[in-house]
């Protein structure tokens, strides 16, 4: 499709307007209620000719699945509709729920993470329908809840319920329109130590659970730390972080309990089950008395890596180069996307979208309108390559 087929100024206005409409529909966590914004997306895509379904496993956490076409390949575009809270309103120069256009940017809560990406997906869905839909295969758009809390009631629910079984999954996220095709896995582990309470004036009469936790943590640092230091894959590292520790209830009491939670990030070649077993084995070897230490897995998913020279990655790469005039750049993220729920399915997963991740979760969050336009143009070209669209939009 030629550059002349789009009025770029009109496209910029359309995308900015869609984004403002999304920002004006709060979906903050807590409580993460996506019913209003999901209804908006569902109605828009149903009007465009999509078959739509709104599905939820938890009250208020609505997820939309909108599909056009049939058969294979099945491309699923996914983006989360929930946002973090706006925080202190005094830190915002505009109403965070207004979607204000300031020069060449749109400012508002979720502008970068991830309502900017959602705006481009809604436009993309409309444009695919305007061009007659896929000539082969099908495309689905999913707008999900429960991402900001890494919860199970958004993308994971859609996969578990069998509502989407993609061959290609495109996760909308603020990557500055660069592709992320390799993502680390994630494992959260909780360790609980128990002891025996006593008066602090006679600590030997008790058994200090915090001190016990200290020994367990030291065992993990000494036993796992050196191993992780040797596990690297280019710019990616295998990591462990002690992110939370909580114990005791008063300064003058020997604590009878302590809890710690650990975040492990895994290279795509590592296995989440093996990573948990490795932690549990080191904790066991710490030598604490039986029944005084418990290790449990809170959540876990493997990482993923897509081939960079074929399939969807090649289609996106060609579209990016066609739009920007330079070869596609690949990015890495320190976080985890909802793509992790499909990491073991043997499919292509790409994380891609407008905006800078550093803008997310901050006051005066914004996204460049030009980045929205680029994301929209790149994605429609990639879909055209992968599914074939019947006619250009004029």
Predicted regions and their residues:
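A structural signal for isolated positions on well-ordered beta-strands in alpha/beta enzyme cores
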Residues: 53, 76, 140-142, 294
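Metal-dependent amide/peptide-bond hydrolase catalytic core
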Residues: 1-3, 10, 56-58, 181, ...
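N-terminal helical capping/dimerization or prosegment-like subdomains
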Residues: 2-89, 257-261, 275-278, 315, ...
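Short helix-capping segments at alpha-helix termini
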Residues: 48, 131-135, 163, 285-290, ...
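Active-site metal-coordination/substrate-binding segment of hydrolases
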Residues: 74-140
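Fold-level recognition of mixed alpha/beta catalytic cores in primary-metabolism enzymes, strongest
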Residues: 111-112, 116-222, 361-374
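Acidic-glycine-rich active-site phosphate/pyrophosphate-binding loop
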Residues: 86-101, 166, 181-192, 350
